[in-house]
Amino acid sequence: MSYPGDKADALSITDFQRRLALAPNTEAVDQFNPSAEIQRLNLRFDITKLRSALANLEQRKSFSDEVWGVIPLTQRPSQSGPWSDNDLSGRYYMRADERYEEAAFEDCVDEAEFSELVPDLADTYFAHVHEVLTRHMKIGRMRLLRKVAYSANSWHRDPEPRIHIPIITNPGSLLIVNHHCTHLPADGHVYFTDTRAYHTAVNGGLRSRVHLTAALPEGLL
């Protein structure tokens, strides 16, 4: 039986023995390492104000789930009720088993519909973030995503790319896109992540990680 990785180069035993003598780099694990699909933008917010806004918001609202929690920051215009379960997640694609065949999961979400800031956030720093982002790009669902310690997402791809603004993080919080792995520091920067490629998020640290994310509907495939 053949597998998709069979054509990859294999390390010879001689090279393997040489490799054993080389010490790995253990000092750069908390640094940002860009790739074609993960880029830091020249756009930055005040991390102290972001963390303060998050702490204040958590006194009023709860994350939707104990493991992969969501707090919506935008909504459909004049929306009166909460997001549906599908709105919290939305369409994604996986190659879920040994057949390596892609399948779609959950229903599509029209990201462009989520154009309005949730009204009770108008007096928060998240309103400033929303105003600045929409000045530079079209965004869809803007959410706070929490990832608890010792957890990971599925290996999947989305219909459109995302931006990430890390707020609470740790060196074990990693993003992997097309097998490229990097940490995203919580330094106030906006990070472009092309989540149209296969990706996952991992929190291998001791504390929860919280990112502000926003979908980019103009990148819909």
Language model: regions and residue ranges:
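Residues that flank catalytic or metal-binding motifs in active/ligand-binding sites
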Residues: 140, 159-161, 208
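Short, conserved beta-strand element in jelly-roll/cupin
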Residues: 146, 157-173
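A short beta-strand-loop-beta hairpin characteristic of the jelly-roll/cupin
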Residues: 166-186
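Non-heme Fe(II)/2-oxoglutarate
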Residues: 2-129
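Short beta-strand His + acidic residue motifs that chelate non-heme Fe in jelly-roll/DSBH
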Residues: 153-155, 173-175, 184, 193-205
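Residues in well-ordered beta-strands of folded domains
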Residues: 143-145, 166, 176, 202, ...
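A short glycine-rich, His/Asp/Glu-containing loop-to-beta-strand
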Residues: 127-149
